[in-house]
Curated annotation (Swiss-Prot):
This is FMN-dependent NADH:quinone oxidoreductase 1. Keywords: Flavoprotein, FMN, NAD, Oxidoreductase. Pfam families: Flavodoxin_2. FMN binds at S10, S16, H17, S18, S145, R146, G147, G148. Its EC number is 1.6.5.-, 1.7.1.17.
Length: 212
């Protein structure tokens, strides 16, 4: 049975363009995979706390198997999010570009799932840290929208794109390298072009849904 975890990162919820595009994809995916399992995780409306000092102390406790109960409680949500990620074969992330990066809820989610001993390991080699990704066999679709244009590959503002490019880096760090990005651009800078861009993005998403 195919399984998809959808991470919704916009604080605008259903009014978000990236969310609407992702929903169109997910609807098409469900139609193509009637026996598939879809799980949704809302992180864009303040539902997910950012990591705290207590979280950091617990996550990097030198003896993870001997964490006090209080530390285990500090990591309970993170443990749940990691387990949720590992339990699904496919991941769909809807995340608009906010000030050249991702919404803070997406950053919080990444901070919770990039976990030493769970999604990556590290060891010293001649005093230099070597990282080992632990997540295997996952495939990711990033659905994004951008107020301006030219932020995609080869665009004039590509170097300013720290949104989906950063997500690729973070996911690759834990072992997820099969990543596809579908973007709609120009909501604020070129409304007429944006409508066309959304249409093109949706057509691409509907095609991707058949084999995701």
């Amino acid at each position: 049975m195919s399984t998809v975890l959808a991470i919704h990162g916009s604080p605008r919820g259903e009014r978000s363009h990236s969310r609407r595009l992702a929903d169109a994809f997910l609807q098409a995916w469900q139609a193509a995979n009637p026996q598939g399992r879809l799980t949704r995780r809302e992180v864009g409306r303040g539902a997910l706390p950012h990591v705290s000092e207590a979280f950091i102390a617990a996550a990097f406790y030198p003896q993870p198997e001997a964490r006090p109960l209080s530390m285990q409680a500090d990591l309970a949500l993170s443990d749940e999010l990691v387990a949720e990620l590992l339990d699904h074969q496919r991941l769909v992330i809807s995340a608009p570009m906010h000030n050249f990066s991702v919404p803070s809820g997406i950053k919080a989610w990444v901070d919770h799932i990039v976990r030493l001993g769970l999604t990556f390991n590290t060891q010293q080699d001649n005093g230099v840290a070597q990282y080992q990704p632990l997540v295997q066999g996952k495939k990711v679709l990033i659905v994004t929208s951008r107020g301006g244009g030219g932020f995609g590959p080869g665009g004039e503002h590509e170097a300013m794109n720290h949104a989906d490019r950063w997500l690729r880096t973070a996911l690759g760090f834990i072992g997820i390298e099969d990543v596809t990005v579908v973007a709609a651009e120009g909501e604020e800078s070129a409304p007429e072009r944006f409508a066309q861009s959304c249409g093109e993005a949706q057509q691409r998403l509907l095609a991707l849904a058949q084999s995701f």
